[in-house]
Amino acid sequence: MMSAFMEKLSLPFRAVRWACILVRQGKTRLLLADSWTRLYKAWMEGLYALTYRLGGRLVGPPNVTIRLQTGHPVAYESPDHLIPFGTSQNNSTNKKFVMSMRARLQRDFPAQTFGTLDLGCSGGQLVRDFLDLGYVAVGLEGSDYSLKARRANWPALAGKHLFTCDIAHPFQIHIDERPAQFHLITMWEVLEHIETARLGQLFDNIVKHLAPGGYFVASTTSEPDVHEGVDLHQTKWTNAEWRAHLAKSHPQLVWTDLGLAYYQMVRHNEERSFLTYRRTS
């Protein structure tokens, strides 16, 4: 497992290799979109630093105790655990998304302490960003790779705000020993990794942990993702197929428009497919 220093050192080489692969595959549109997204994110990082860090608006984590109850602490059967590709590399965030959702939650839930849950959190940076704003932020990751490698935010947040868990099995998060409900639940490049037969339980977990009026935001893709001869994507549905499935299986989730472009989301793919929902009562 790579040290944090070696992981950072390898980033430029991985980026060049990935760019060459996209060019060979004729996916220059995706390469250009990703390059623009990276520039935009860097600009937002600067704006965020001026507005929040230098402005003294980062209050830090609230004083709460978070406990995860699960009979499946690791997704041992998942290809992502057996071949830890994305979970060993990703630590994504987008300060525009963070600032936009902060404004939206303040409007919709005034005078409340906000809660956010990132499912498939990888390195946990999105959790870290919401913690800095004073939110009750939690991240669940199916693989224990980042925990064991002590990468990204896991050394500081493991067992307190970051936990390993197979999210396709029943679980319950407790905050100060009370069942938790969150105002925002996110999944970035995760849904397609879930076995189709387990989607029902997954969305039962999501609805149970989503406060009435709360938001569910996810990215999806219908493309394969093959590593070491194994396709890590187990449910390759189009955006329309996901929406049809949710309309039938979990009608309490209602489609909503966040008014965000693809480069303002935390992660995106060539399809620019996103699921943006609110929970009814």
Predicted features, each with a name:
Residues 252-264:
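Conserved S-adenosyl-L-methionine
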Residues 213-221:
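Conserved beta-strand signature within the Rossmann-like core of class I S-adenosyl-L-methionine
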Residues 189, 221-223:
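Histidine-centered beta-alpha loop that forms part of the nucleotide-sugar donor binding/catalytic region
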Residues 184-190:
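A short beta-strand submotif of the Rossmann-like class I SAM-dependent methyltransferase core
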Residues 200-212:
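A short glycine-rich, Lys/Arg-flanked "PGG" loop and its adjoining helix->strand segment in the class I
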Residues 193-194:
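A short His-aromatic
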Residues 225-230:
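A short acidic, helix-capping loop that chelates divalent metal ions and anchors anionic groups
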Residues 5-180, 184, 197-203, 235-241, ...:
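Conserved N-terminal segment of class I S-adenosyl-L-methionine
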